[in-house]
């Protein structure tokens, strides 16, 4: 990494990294030079002053689109039990308000199968299990602000994926795998013992046990125990979740790549691995997009996980503030905002 001149930074890679632009927005890659007396920034605003209670920003006169930046100054403050109307924008609002919007996060909530466990190793069995679950019912009753989804990837990353409904008769699929009322499938479901996870798990178990072919042993454990069991592969079906570090499908698709340290489900598929590695090497954007679609569809077709919903962030935006648009990463940039003046 080196500066060619005052305005050009050159980054040379040892291999193709198609998601580098998205990765550069991650906090771990921010500039190391951070002298508090003269912080460096190339954004729409510069730090004017900061302390433990507030951060004051001033418009950057060198910003390339400075003429499109409305506010001369922006102040960031901690939100501590005060009226929302005292602010223009409040992120992660703890209360209900008419000016509340929910911005999608790159975070999914799902249950994970241990694909090395013979009871759930067959795709047809997992498909039968998934067909018994109503994600809408669970979400509407437990976390209505979330986005119900039976897809593993966040909604914004599903470009081109077929969303047609596929009729599935769970009992037929289970019977084909020698599972019946006399010889039911015994499932062990692990989840954390905090109230939200308990409530979701109870609804999930209630839906699964509507079939006489399933017997479910549900166990609530501490978060630490849940993580330890996931790490060891000591589970059959386990409550899970994932938040992407950067806005790119590979941040989710890597969970099923056999060589990934984040693969805790035991999935190992030569075709999936080959496609995944091909996407990493390809310099053709269209080809990469087609591969992402194939990988995502493979996850869905084999029911490699049991997705329930995508998280959202509640954001209060004053009715006088314009320019805030919902986006796939749930980010609001001050440079995009402007105030509507009442006549």
Listing of model-derived features with the role each one plays in the protein:
Residues 7-9, 81-96, 207, 213-215, ...:
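Alpha-to-beta junction loops
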């Amino acid at each position: 990494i080196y500066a060619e001149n005052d305005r050009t930074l050159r980054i040379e890679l040892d291999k193709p990294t198609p998601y580098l632009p998205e990765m550069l927005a991650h906090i771990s890659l921010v500039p190391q030079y951070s002298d508090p007396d003269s912080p460096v920034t190339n954004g729409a605003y510069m730090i004017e002053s900061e302390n433990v209670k507030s951060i004051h920003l001033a418009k950057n006169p060198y910003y390339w689109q400075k003429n499109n930046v409305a506010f001369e100054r922006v102040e960031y403050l901690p939100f501590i039990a005060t009226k929302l109307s005292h602010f223009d924008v409040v992120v992660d609002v703890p209360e209900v308000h008419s000016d509340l919007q929910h911005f999608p996060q790159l975070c999914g909530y799902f249950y994970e199968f241990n694909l090395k466990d013979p009871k759930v190793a067959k795709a047809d069995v997992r498909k039968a299990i998934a067909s018994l679950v109503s994600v809408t019912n669970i979400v509407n009753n437990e976390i209505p602000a979330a986005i119900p989804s039976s897809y593993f990837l966040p909604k914004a990353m599903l470009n081109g994926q077929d969303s047609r409904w596929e009729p599935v008769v769970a009992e037929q699929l289970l019977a084909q795998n020698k599972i019946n009322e006399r010889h039911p499938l015994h499932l062990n479901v692990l989840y954390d013992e905090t109230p939200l996870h308990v409530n979701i798990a109870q609804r999930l178990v209630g839906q699964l046990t509507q079939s006489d072919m399933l017997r479910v042993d549900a166990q609530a454990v501490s978060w630490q125990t849940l993580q330890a069991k996931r790490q060891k592969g000591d589970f059959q079906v386990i409550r899970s979740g994932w938040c992407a570090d950067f806005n790119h499908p590979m941040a989710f698709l890597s969970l099923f790549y056999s060589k990934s340290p984040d693969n805790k489900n035991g999935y190992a598929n030569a075709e999936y691995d080959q496609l995944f590695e091909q996407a990493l090497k390809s310099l053709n954007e269209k080809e990469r997009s087609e591969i992402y679609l194939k990988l995502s569809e493979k996850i869905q077709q084999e029911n490699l996980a049991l997705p329930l919903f995508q998280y959202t962030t509640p954001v209060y935006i004053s009715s006088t503030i314009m320019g805030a648009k919902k986006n796939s990463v749930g980010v609001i940039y001050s440079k995009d905002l402007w105030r509507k003046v009442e006549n």
